[in-house]
């Protein structure tokens, strides 16, 4: 499976709807994303668009963005697989909930709920 990992801190959520059939949103710090990508089910990681990446052990990973509250990423599994997406959705669900709890904000919590609702609609 080819997995594209894109930091999307500067991409409007509305623009992501263009990818709605084959993408996932993940919120987490870099080390959390790194742990997800080390899963045996994820074979390869490649860059997309013009973001800067660096090479580590023959795999491409996004340059960590230092942010105390976490980083928002877009994961695009290709080809689209319902089973794969369900597994990644479960991971996304947990990370987004943890992220929302850490921020302890109604606005952030609502954003997390919106992201999860959107994922549910697209993937399940």
Swiss-Prot record:
Keyword Transmembrane: yes
GO cellular component, one term: membrane
Membrane topology value: Single-pass membrane protein
Origin species: Saccharomyces cerevisiae (strain ATCC 204508 / S288c) (Baker's yeast)
UniProt name for this protein: Putative uncharacterized protein YFL012W-A
TM region(s), chain numbering: 83-100
Compartments where found: Membrane
Keywords associated with the record: Membrane, Transmembrane, Transmembrane helix
Leftover remarks: Partially overlaps IES1.
Primary subcellular site in the record, as a coarse category: membrane
């Amino acid at each position: 499976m080819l997995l594209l990992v894109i930091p999307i801190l500067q991409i409007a959520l509305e623009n992501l709807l263009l990818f709605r059939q084959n993408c996932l949103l993940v919120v987490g710090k870099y080390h959390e994303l790194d742990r997800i990508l080390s899963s045996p089910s994820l074979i390869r990681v490649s860059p997309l668009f013009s973001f800067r990446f660096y090479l580590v052990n023959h795999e491409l990973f996004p340059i960590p963005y230092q942010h105390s509250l976490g980083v928002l990423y877009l994961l695009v599994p290709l080809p689209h697989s319902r089973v794969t997406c369900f597994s990644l959705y479960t991971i996304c669900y947990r990370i987004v909930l943890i992220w929302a709890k850490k921020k302890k904000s109604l606005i952030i919590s609502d954003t997390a709920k919106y992201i999860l609702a959107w994922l549910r609609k697209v993937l399940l």
